Amino acid sequence: MVSLPGARYIRAPQQGTDAMTDIASAEATGSVTGGLRTLLRLEGLALFAGMTLLYAVWGGSWWVYALLFLVPDLSFAGYLAGPRVGAIIYNAAHSYMAPMTLMTSGFGLDSPLTLSIALIWLAHIGIDRALGYGLKYSAGFGFTHLGRIGKDARTTA
């Protein structure tokens, strides 16, 4: 096997260990650190500010903005079915893919409501990322692509 400088290799679990636990542990450590983490959080802040500004320019209702801003966090309920299902549902609600598709549809269909929902949704994702709440790993809610959060954060350097 050729070894690449700086490459990390995940070894197979040893006999007598739980492969699922080892996989979850490997996933949970895959978060960014240092300057890259700061850059991703600043990108989140820029997304929040940009989408909120676009919403204001678009002339959306601030009551609607306030009412819908936390709707993506209803995806927390997925954790009632366990960490794996919770992570899948949370990540579906906090990925850029669905709101960007909705935004494109809003422009294409000239639908102010659709566009407003997309802008609010993206603003929500942006502020979450700015605050360090990244996409979740199946190891548990506290394990994100931006690092550990909550009580799990104390074990992160």
Predicted regions located by residue number:
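N-terminal membrane-targeting hydrophobic helices
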Residues: V2-A157
